[in-house]
């Protein structure tokens, strides 16, 4: 689960929040 949190942070750092679910960053 911790790795998912790190991945989520990395995704939000490179992707706009609006596209959070569009890129499957969860």
Curated annotation (Swiss-Prot):
Post-translational modification: Contains 7 disulfide bonds.
Annotated transmembrane regions: none
Subcellular location, record wording: Secreted
One function term, GO molecular function aspect: phospholipase A2 activity
InterPro entries noted in UniProt: PLipase_A2_dom_sf (IPR036444)
SUPFAM superfamilies for the chain: Phospholipase A2, PLA2
GO cellular component terms, semicolon-separated: extracellular region
GO biological process, one term: phospholipid metabolic process
Key words of the record: Disulfide bond, Secreted
Coiled coil start-end: none
Tissue distribution: Expressed by the venom gland.
Keyword Disulfide bond in annotation: yes
UniProt record similarity statement: Belongs to the phospholipase A2 family. Group I subfamily.
Name recorded for this polypeptide: Phospholipase A2 homolog A1
Protein's organism: Micrurus pyrrhocryptus
């Amino acid at each position: 689960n911790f790795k998912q949190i790190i991945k989520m942070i990395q995704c939000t750092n490179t992707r706009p929040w609006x596209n959070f679910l569009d890129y499957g960053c969860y």
